[in-house]
């Protein structure tokens, strides 16, 4: 690598779509029984976040809709969506920018608040050297809907992640 790292966000930057909404849509389509469960868990998370003093915006950004999902299922669906839908939603400009950085021998890093299985699938497709997405260190079993202990915490932002990555590369 040339000593330069280029950091990218996913949704709205490289991808002209919401990867996590697309994943949630497929999950609901394939497992419709999850809709009332996901709605209830999201609502409970929203109310709980409001009671803890979070803003309405932050309270609404919870992962209750993914509660009781299996990490392996999310991985499989994410890979399928990247192959069939999301790869077509990456703009030509984004692909050209990534290609330019690759030609310059820059290290490419994806830093996103998207759930980790989707972030990893997109990073693999885009040829990223590293990826930081939302998820616990050990992604096995069933999701609870809580983000406690997850990487790339939404409330603290991506800056600490980028700073830590930059220090680790130096």
Question: How would you label these PLM feature ranges?
Answer:
Residues 20, 56-59, 141-146:
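Acidic/polar active-site rim loop that often engages polyanionic ligands
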Residues 27-30, 81, 169:
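Alpha-helix boundary/capping residues
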Residues 22-23, 35-39, 61, 73, ...:
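Exposed alpha-helical structural elements
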């Amino acid at each position: 690598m040339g000593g330069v790292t280029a950091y990218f966000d996913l949704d709205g930057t490289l991808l002209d779509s919401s990867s996590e909404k697309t994943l949630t849509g497929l999950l609901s389509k394939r497992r419709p029984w999850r809709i009332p469960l996901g709605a209830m868990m999201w609502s409970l998370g929203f109310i709980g976040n409001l009671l803890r003093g979070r803003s309405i915006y932050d309270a609404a950004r919870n992962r209750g809709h993914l509660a009781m999902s299996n990490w392996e299922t999310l991985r499989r669906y994410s890979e399928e969506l990247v192959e069939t839908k999301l790869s077509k939603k990456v703009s030509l400009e984004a692909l050209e920018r990534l290609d330019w950085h690759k030609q310059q021998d820059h290290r490419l890093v994806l830093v996103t608040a998207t759930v980790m299985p989707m972030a990893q699938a997109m990073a693999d497709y885009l040829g990223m050297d590293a990826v930081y997405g939302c998820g616990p260190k050990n992604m096995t079993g069933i999701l609870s809907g809580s983000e406690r202990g997850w990487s790339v915490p939404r409330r603290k932002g991506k800056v600490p992640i980028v700073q830590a990555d930059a220090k680790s590369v130096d």
